[in-house]
Amino acid sequence: MVFSSYKLPDLPYDYDALEPVISAEIMHLHHQKHHQGYINNLNEALKSLDVASATQDLTGLIAINPALRFNGGGHINHSLFWEMLAPQNKGGGTPPRHELLKLIEKFWGSFDNFLKNFISSSAAVQGSGWGWLAFCPKKQELMIQTTANQDPLEATTGMIPLLGVDVWEHAYYLQYKNARLDYLKNFPSIINWDYIESRFVEMSK
C-alpha cells in the first residue's frame, strides 16, 4: 500500500487578516513552521508505514502509531482551525443563526453562556491541547470537549469537531505571553460561524 503525501493547505486569508487578535507573526509561524512540521513528520511516518506493511513487520507497524496519531492529528486539527477563523471584516465573530444557534441555546441557555463555558474549559487544559465545540451524531447533541496534545477529536471520541481553539503555546505565546485566558477572551471575535454552521448542517443530516 502506497500512501499519498499530504501538503500544507493555503490559508483562506492573509497572515495579518486576524490582527489584532492574532498577529501576523504568529500566523506565519503557526502555518508555515508548525503545521508544515506536522505534515513533514506525517509523510515520513507514512513512508515507514509503507515499508513495515510491505514487509509485514507487525512490531514496526505498531511502533509507527504514536507518530501517526500525533502528526496526523496535528494536520487534521490545524486544517480545520484555519477554516474556523475569519477576519472581523469578513464575518469573523458574527454569531451563528438558524438551527445551530437554537441548539446552543438549548444546551447552554444562551450564546454568551456557551462562550463563557467554552473559554473556561479551554483555559483549563493542562499543558498543550485543544478546546472543542463537538457534535455527537448518535445523540444529536452538542458538547464542549477538550483533547490533549494533537489528538484528533473525531478519531479518538467519535465526536464531530465544529469549533476548535488551539491552546498550545505556539498559538499565542509570542503575543500574549503566559496569558492564555486573554487570548481565549479575544478569540470569539474571529470565529467563522458561517463555516461552522455549514459543517453542522452537513454533519447533522
Curated annotation (Swiss-Prot):
Alphabetical list of Pfam families matching this protein: Sod_Fe_C, Sod_Fe_N
Keywords for the protein's UniProt record, in alphabetical order: Manganese, Metal-binding, Oxidoreductase
Swiss-Prot/TrEMBL cofactor(s): Mn(2+)
Domain of life of the source: Bacteria
EC number: 1.15.1.1
Statement: the UniProt record of this protein carries the keyword S-adenosyl-L-methionine: no
GO MF terms, alphabetically ordered: manganese ion binding; superoxide dismutase activity
Residues reported in the UniProt entry to bind Mn(2+): 30, 78, 166, 170
Gene3D superfamilies: Fe,Mn superoxide dismutase (SOD) domain, Iron/manganese superoxide dismutase, C-terminal domain
Cofactor binding notes: Binds 1 Mn(2+) ion per subunit.
Catalysed reactions, semicolon-separated: 2 superoxide + 2 H(+) = H2O2 + O2
Family: Belongs to the iron/manganese superoxide dismutase family.
Quaternary structure, from the entry: Homodimer.
Role this protein plays: Destroys superoxide anion radicals which are normally produced within the cells and which are toxic to biological systems.
Record protein name field: Superoxide dismutase [Mn]
Provenance organism: Chlamydia muridarum (strain MoPn / Nigg)
Lineage of origin: Bacteria, Pseudomonadati, Chlamydiota, Chlamydiia, Chlamydiales
